[in-house]
Design a protein with these regions (language model features):
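Beta-propeller-forming repeat regions
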Residues: 1-126
Length: 126
């Protein structure tokens, strides 16, 4: 598996994450994640096929944001959070899977820092 470059825009409202690969001469679109509001994600696959998903809750069941909308912050963390051997991308209170689909959304909005670690060693996973 080759690494991709991920470009991200949006902290306080809409959140866009765009993954591209380099084929040796140019950037090639891999996927685009667009959290366009608190409950809607538009996803474009490698062929620009669009799917739209609606969310009515987030991962923790608290907070007001169900997608990456309004959950951004000023840095990005990358790691294999779900144990599938591929890295996920976290911006603020939301994580996008390696295919650009929303994986987690805590829903507490804009934070100032990200700390990803095995904070509870007795609990499986991160």
């Amino acid at each position: 598996m080759k690494p991709s470059a991920v470009f991200i825009r949006g902290y306080y409202t809409r959140c866009y994450m765009w993954a591209v690969d380099f084929d040796g001469t140019k950037l090639v679109h891999r996927w685009l994640h667009a959290s366009v509001n608190d409950s809607t994600v538009e996803h474009y696959d490698s062929r620009w096929n669009k799917t739209t998903k609606s969310y009515s809750s987030n991962t923790c069941g608290m907070g007001q944001h169900f997608t990456a909308f309004g959950n951004g912050n000023h840095n990005v963390s990358v790691g294999d959070y779900d144990g599938d051997g591929r890295d996920e991308v976290t911006i603020g209170s939301a994580t996008v899977d390696d295919d650009g689909q929303l994986l987690y959304s805590v829903g507490f909005g804009h934070g100032d820092a990200i700390h990803v670690s095995d904070l509870i060693p007795s609990r499986p996973g991160l």
